[in-house]
């Protein structure tokens, strides 16, 4: 019974209330912070649980009044409303009971690379960057470019952006994978549709405590920054290339104004990549069914097609097709795709948890 599953949450919440008012905890900032965070995380399920249990009590009270000559009709109407509310609350509670992704509230690094298709792929990276920037603005996220390499005719060969905002990972994690684009290039005189592809990697930002890097495992090179076409953009050795020797991961950053700033940014990206590698290894050890709930997020997995001649965008993980590609790209309306993906993910998780 669902009500019995809620009891531990209610008891723990009351326990936390008592602990947070005790002098021992008040005088211990570290414990106070930890327990306050736990209480905040429990609050949504506790509030919904109390509403649900109150609804169950009200249902029983109104059932007892059905044969009352004065209150029977009123109880019947009230009971109808409560019986409709009960399953809605149950579904909301089941969603809240699902295991939380520990990365969901983090900022993210969004790494986009041009793949097959040459210049067309680079141009689409540029278009997608603009669309993601609008999406970030819509949701109140802050977006900053960490590093970039421009394409020869525009757009980007590759770009790394930091997206800051509560829940950024919880939504944009669904963007990881291969994005295929079909459109007629401006240089195409015959009107033929060309197909190109880009890859998106979504990496949660991590702190120093979570990822420790031995300085002896790093090779740090400094060089002149180069701009569009390879020309030097300044006369100082400000660009930084960091190689993590054990894994072979290489990060280059030249967008900052100083060597120190570029090294700091490159280290953040390196930590995110190492964390992503660890997470991928962990996921690989779990069951394939769980890994493929909405798609693995592997950058080699083709997740979406953007067909410009048909104004069509298709997400292959959930067989979703929308004929409003122009609006989605122009206004950054990715929630029209992300929301169905979240719903699908939750349905799969509910089935797995037998809720």
Curated annotation (Swiss-Prot):
Location (main, coarse): cytoplasm
Residue numbers carrying N5-methylglutamine: 231
One of the record's GO molecular function terms: translation release factor activity, codon specific
The record's account of how the chain is modified after translation: Methylated by PrmC. Methylation increases the termination efficiency of RF1.
GO CC aspect terms: cytoplasm
Annotated localization: Cytoplasm
Ranges of compositional bias, category Basic and acidic residues: 280-291
Family the entry assigns: Belongs to the prokaryotic/mitochondrial release factor family.
Purpose of the protein: Peptide chain release factor 1 directs the termination of translation in response to the peptide chain termination codons UAG and UAA.
Designated name of the protein: Peptide chain release factor 1
Species name: Campylobacter jejuni (strain RM1221)
């Amino acid at each position: 019974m669902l009500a019995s599953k809620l009891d531990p949450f209610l008891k723990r919440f009351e326990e936390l209330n008592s602990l947070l008012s005790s002098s021992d905890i008040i005088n211990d900032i570290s414990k106070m912070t930890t327990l306050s965070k736990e209480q905040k995380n429990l609050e949504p399920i506790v509030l919904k649980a109390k509403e649900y249990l109150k609804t169950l009590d009200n249902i029983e009270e109104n059932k007892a009044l059905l044969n009352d000559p004065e209150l029977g009709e009123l109880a019947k109407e009230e009971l109808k409303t409560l019986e409709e509310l009960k399953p809605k609350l149950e579904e909301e509670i089941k969603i809240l009971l699902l295991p939380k992704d520990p990365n969901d509230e983090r900022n993210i690094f969004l790494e986009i690379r041009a793949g097959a298709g040459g210049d067309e792929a680079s141009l689409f990276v540029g278009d997608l960057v603009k669309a993601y920037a609008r999406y970030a603005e819509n949701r109140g996220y802050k977006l900053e470019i960490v590093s970039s390499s421009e394409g020869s005719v525009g757009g980007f060969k590759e770009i790394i952006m930091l997206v800051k905002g509560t829940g950024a990972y919880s939504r944009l994690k669904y963007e990881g994978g291969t994005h295929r684009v079909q459109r007629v290039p401006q240089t195409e005189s015959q009107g033929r549709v060309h197909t190109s592809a880009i890859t998106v990697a979504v990496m949660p930002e991590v702190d120093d405590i979570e990822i420790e890097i031995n300085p002896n495992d790093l090779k740090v090179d400094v060089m002149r920054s180069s701009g569009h076409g390879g020309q030097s953009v300044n006369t100082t050795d400000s660009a930084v290339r960091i190689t993590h020797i054990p894994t072979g991961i290489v990060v280059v950053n030249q967008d900052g104004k100083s060597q120190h700033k570029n090294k700091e940014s490159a280290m953040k990206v390196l930590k995110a990549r190492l964390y992503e590698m660890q997470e991928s290894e962990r996921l690989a050890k779990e069951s394939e069914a769980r890994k493929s709930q909405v798609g693995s997020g592997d950058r080699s997995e083709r997740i979406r097609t953007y067909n410009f001649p048909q104004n069509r965008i298709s997400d292959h993980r959930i067989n979703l097709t929308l004929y409003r590609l122009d609006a989605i790209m122009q206004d950054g309306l990715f929630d029209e795709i992300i929301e169905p993906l979240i719903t699908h993910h939750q349905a799969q998780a509910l089935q797995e948890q037998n809720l």
